Amino acid sequence: MSKLLVLLMTTALATLAQAISFDCSDKPPECQNDPGCCFDIGITTF
């Protein structure tokens, strides 16, 4: 049961990271070079 929970959390984190990366690639180049900018926008969109 605990292994299943870990797998679920890992999948959720990977999905979230992918969503943030996707949002970042959508932004202007000067924003893409700034992880803080990308991360901020990703969280806001999410």
UniProtKB/Swiss-Prot annotation:
Residues 1-19 form the signal peptide. Keywords: Secreted, Signal, Toxin. It is found in: Secreted. Its main location: secreted. Expressed by the venom secretory cell of the spine. The spine is a cuticular structure containing a single large nucleated venom-secreting cell at its base. It is an independent unit capable of producing, storing and injecting venom. On the back of D.vulnerans caterpillars, spines are grouped together by 50 to 100 to form scoli, of which there are eight in D.vulnerans. GO terms for cellular component: extracellular region. Disulfide bonds: none annotated. GO terms for molecular function: toxin activity. Probable toxin. Does not show insecticidal, antimicrobial and antiparasitic activities. Does not induce increase in intracellular calcium in mouse DRG neurons, suggesting that it does not induce pain. Belongs to the limacoditoxin-6 family. This is U-limacoditoxin(6)-Dv61.
